[in-house]
Amino acid sequence: MGQKVNPIGMRLQVNRTWDSRWYADDKDYGNLLLEDLKIRDFIKKEAKQAGVSRVVIERPHKKCRVTIYAARPGVIIGKKGADIETLRKKLANFTGSELHLNIVEVRKPELDAQLVAESIAQQLERRVSFRRAMKRAVQNAMRMGALGIRVNVSGRLGGAEIARTEWYREGRVPLHTLRADIDYALSEASTPYGIIGVKVWIFKGEIMEHDPQARDRRATEAQDGPSPRGPRRDRDRDAR
């Protein structure tokens, strides 16, 4: 089961939650869902150079809150915040309501599956050897602290007549373990020989608490820095 389904969808409400967090009646649901798709597509095109990883959309009462996770937030913010204000006004045209825009920096893009997949896809479009691109991504992820990573590329690799699939893995990637914090992403490289699909799985550890917000909370704590308090068992051992 875990080998076939999307790892993110399998772990929803276990250690991860949705990227669209709102509730609507049946008559409004379709329109709001279409708005979300348009907002995400627009941000991906406008902030292509910023390395956008995720776009989280929340809709409190008659408002819209958009949070962009990006590797280079300065590209979105611009000089003295001019570009982010322009982007906010353009996004407000999609919703027709008050819109709040937040930018969150991705401190370790080597551990973000979406950014890794897009990086490999861009290298393939520049005709870099797929084996070199895969191996470089795996080495960078393991160096930055990943417990395991798997990269899968499929298509007419190297311009071959027959499409095939190649994959490379290092460490462990437990797809059946629900408490495993596994980041997954898919990207596509457009080459003269056709489309090459790139899939990336990154295993970052285990989240023991049963909390859908646990993954987002862990990301926030990683950006704020380590807690000044040590592990409880270390304090108990020192006391003894």
Curated annotation (Swiss-Prot):
The keyword Ribosomal protein applies. SMART domains: KH (SM00322). Pfam families: KH_2, Ribosomal_S3_C. Residues 39-107 form the KH type-2 domain. It comes from the Bacteria. Binds the lower part of the 30S subunit head. Binds mRNA in the 70S ribosome, positioning it for translation. HAMAP family: Ribosomal_uS3_B (MF_01309_B). This is Small ribosomal subunit protein uS3.
